[in-house]
C-alpha cells in the first residue's frame, strides 16, 4: 500500500521543531503573515514560489527543493484521485518506427 503524500508543510514543521521556533517567530523572520505559516503546517495551503524563495534564503536551501516538494505532493495526490480513471479512459498513443 502506498504511503500518504507528504505535504511540504510537514518538512517545514520538522525544521521549526529542530530550530525550536514558533510560527509567529518564523513569520516575522520571513516577513509573511503568520496565517500563511499556520496553513502550510496544516497542509491547507500550497507552498508558493514566493514562500520557497523566502525559506531558501532563510534556511540556506534552494527554492527549487521547496517547489519540488510541493509538485511531488500535488502529483501524488492527483495520482491517487485520478490516476486509475485516466489510465482507463485515455489510450496510450502508438508510436511508429521508421523501417
Residue ranges and their predicted role:
Residues 65-99:
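Short, charged recognition helix plus adjacent turn
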Residues 44-57:
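Short, basic-rich loop-to-helix N-cap that marks the start of a DNA-contacting helix
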Residues 21-39:
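Short alpha-helical DNA-recognition segment
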Residues 33, 44, 59, 70-73:
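The DNA-recognition helices of helix-turn-helix-type DNA-binding domains
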Residues 17, 28, 57:
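Short polybasic/polar patches that bind polyanions
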